[in-house]
């Protein structure tokens, strides 16, 4: 049993990218679905599909690679706020990742969103992870 399901999710994606897998299957939860939707909307993954094959269900994610160089689009994905040490940031303090080339995923009172969207709405929250 793992104590941090989001870290497990990010590690599965990171390992699949490192092994050049085309698809990764992850146990589902509402938070994981929202993170996956953000990754899709931002162009980091090709597609995703929710499957209700068990009580919990699973998410199948098709990873995205560059057509010419075959390099993965996701260079790194890092967990920031952890169960033992939560990291919060106000709207003004939300970080820019690699000068705007990456994204921060933030859990706000208005839902899960990118750091850029949170700044536009002037809301802060818990910084879940960085993707670049």
From Swiss-Prot:
A Pfam match: Ribosomal_S8
InterPro entries: Ribosomal_uS8 (IPR000630), Ribosomal_uS8_CS (IPR047863), Ribosomal_uS8_sf (IPR035987)
Family, as annotated: Belongs to the universal ribosomal protein uS8 family.
Function statement: One of the primary rRNA binding proteins, it binds directly to 16S rRNA central domain where it helps coordinate assembly of the platform of the 30S subunit.
This protein's name: Small ribosomal subunit protein uS8
Keywords in alphabetical order: Ribonucleoprotein, Ribosomal protein, RNA-binding, rRNA-binding
An annotated Gene Ontology molecular function: rRNA binding
Keyword Ribosomal protein: yes
Disulfide-bonded cysteines: none
GO biological process terms on file: translation
Keyword Ribosomal protein: yes
Self-association and partners: Part of the 30S ribosomal subunit. Contacts proteins S5 and S12.
GO annotation, cellular component aspect: ribonucleoprotein complex; ribosome
């Amino acid at each position: 049993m793992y104590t941090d399901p989001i870290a497990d999710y990010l590690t599965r994606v990171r390992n699949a990218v490192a092994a050049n897998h085309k698809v990764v299957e992850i146990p589902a939860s509402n938070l994981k679905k929202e993170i996956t939707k953000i990754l899709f909307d931002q162009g980091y993954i090709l597609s995703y599909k929710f499957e209700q094959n068990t009580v919990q269900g699973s998410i199948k994610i098709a990873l995205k690679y560059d057509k010419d160089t075959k390099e993965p689009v996701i260079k790194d994905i890092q967990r920031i706020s952890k169960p033992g040490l939560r990291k919060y940031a106000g709207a003004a303090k939300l970080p820019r990742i690699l000068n705007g080339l990456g994204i921060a995923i933030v859990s706000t009172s208005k839902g899960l969103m990118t750091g850029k969207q949170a700044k536009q709405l002037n809301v802060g929250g818990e910084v879940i992870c960085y993707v670049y």
